[in-house]
C-alpha cells in the first residue's frame, strides 16, 4: 500500500514577484519528506475543470530550473473573482477535483480574495449557502498570502510587496529627474484598491512631495497648497504618488468601473487629479505615469554576474 502523501499547490489572483520562489519552497519541503506535489494549472479553474489541469512538480523538473528566479507564475493564475451565490457550487467542484487527485492537502498562494475563499472553504463563512464541504472531507487548506497591495491580515509583508515597492520607487526616482528638467508636477498612479501601503512606501523611499492613499480621504485644496509651498520654496518641480482607489472627503471613490461580477475596477484617478490641478493651479504642468502591471513583473532574482537566468547562458 502506497502511503505517500500528495499535496496540491496553486496560485490564485493577480500575479506578482516571488510566486515561483514560493512554489519552489513547497516542492523542496515536500521532496524532503518524500511527498508528491501536484501543481494545479491556471488557478482554481485547473482543479474545477474536466479533465483536471495539473503537472507533477519535482526538484529535478522545477526547483533546478530557471523559473524560481523569475516573476510571474509558472503554474498560471486566475483573477476573475467568484460571486458569493456561486461559491457553494464552486466549493463542490473544488472538492471533487481534490478527491479525484487524491490530495491530502492543498496550498493556495493568493491575495485577500483568495484568502477569503480559503476561509469560506474551510469554515463556511461569508454566505449561508456556502457548504462546509472541504472541512467535512477533512481537507487541509494552507493559505500563503501574496499581494503587491500588502493588504492581507496577520502578515507584515506579503509575497510580492517588496518587489512592487522597488518598481514604484524606481519610477519616483526617474520622475523626479524628468520633472526637474521640464518644471512639471508629475503624478504616479500605483495599484492599491483599499490599502495604500504600496504608494506610501514608494513615496517615502523616493521622497515624493504628495502621497494619497485610500485610508485617508483627500482634499484637492490640500494638494494645491502643497504645490504652492513647493513653488514658494524655489523648487520648480514636484512628484505626486497616488493609489488607484483613493477617496474624496465624502468617502467616495471618484473613478471605478465594474467587472463581470460587480466588483469595482479602479484606474484613471491620475488623469482626474491632473485635470483638477490644471484647472486650479497654472504654475505647474502635470503629466501622469502608471506602473500598473510592471509592479507585478519585476524578477524575484535579477540576472547577475553576467548570466541571464532566462536563457541560462552567458
Segments (PLM) and residue ranges:
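N-terminal phosphate-binding or glycine-rich loops at protein starts, especially the Walker A/P-loop
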Residues: 2-51
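Short glycine-rich or small-residue beta-strand-to-loop segments that form or flank ligand, phosphate
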Residues: 6-14, 73-78, 105-109, 186-189, ...
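Short, ordered loop/turn segments at secondary-structure junctions
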Residues: 12-15, 40-46, 79-80, 111-114, ...
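Glycine-rich oxoanion-binding loops at beta->alpha junctions
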Residues: 47-108, 113-115, 144, 157-170
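Accessory alpha-helical/coil subdomains and C-terminal extensions
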Residues: 97, 105-111, 116-120, 129-133, ...
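Short beta-strand elements at the ligand-binding edges of bilobed clamshell
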Residues: 154-165, 296-303
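C-terminal non-catalytic interaction/assembly regions of soluble proteins
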Residues: 264-314
Amino acid at each position: 500500500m502506497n502511503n505517500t502523501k500528495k499535496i496540491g499547490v496553486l496560485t490564485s489572483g493577480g500575479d506578482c514577484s516571488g510566486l515561483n520562489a514560493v512554489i519552489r519552497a513547497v516542492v523542496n519541503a515536500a521532496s524532503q519528506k518524500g511527498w508528491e506535489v501536484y501543481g494545479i494549472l491556471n488557478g482554481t479553474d485547473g482543479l474545477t475543470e474536466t479533465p483536471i489541469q495539473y503537472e507533477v512538480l519535482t526538484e529535478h523538473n522545477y526547483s533546478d530550473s530557471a523559473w524560481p528566479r523569475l516573476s510571474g507564475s509558472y503554474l498560471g493564475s486566475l483573477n476573475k473573482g467568484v460571486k458569493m451565490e456561486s461559491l457553494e457550487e464552486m466549493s463542490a467542484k473544488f472538492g471533487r477535483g481534490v478527491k479525484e487527485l487524491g490530495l491530502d492537502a492543498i496550498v493556495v498562494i493568493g491575495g485577500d480574495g483568495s484568502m477569503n475563499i480559503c476561509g469560506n472553504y474551510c469554515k463556511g463563512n461569508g454566505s449561508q449557502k456556502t457548504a462546509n464541504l472541504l472541512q467535512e472531507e477533512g481537507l487541509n487548506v494552507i493559505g500563503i498570502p501574496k499581494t503587491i497591495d500588502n493588504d492581507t491580515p496577520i502578515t507584515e509583508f506579503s509575497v510580492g510587496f517588496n518587489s512592487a515597492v522597488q518598481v514604484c520607487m524606481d519610477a519616483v526616482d526617474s520622475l523626479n529627474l524628468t520633472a526637474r528638467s521640464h518644471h512639471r508636477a508629475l503624478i504616479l498612479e500605483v495599484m492599491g484598491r483599499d490599502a495604500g501601503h504600496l504608494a506610501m512606501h514608494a513615496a517615502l523611499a523616493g521622497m515624493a512631495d504628495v502621497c494619497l492613499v485610500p485610508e485617508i480621504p483627500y482634499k484637492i485644496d490640500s494638494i494645491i497648497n502643497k504645490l504652492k509651498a513647493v513653488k514658494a520654496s524655489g523648487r520648480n518641480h514636484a512628484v505626486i504618488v497616488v493609489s488607484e482607489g483613493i477617496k474624496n472627503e465624502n468617502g467616495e471613490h471618484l473613478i471605478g468601473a465594474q467587472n463581470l461580477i460587480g466588483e469595482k475596477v479602479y484606474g484613471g484617478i491620475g488623469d482626474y487629479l491632473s485635470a483638477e490641478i490644471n484647472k486650479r493651479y497654472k504654475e505647474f504642468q502635470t503629466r501622469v505615469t502608471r506602473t500598473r502591471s510592471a509592479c507585478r513583473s519585476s524578477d524575484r532574482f535579477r540576472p547577475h554576474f553576467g548570466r541571464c537566468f532566462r536563457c541560462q547562458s552567458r
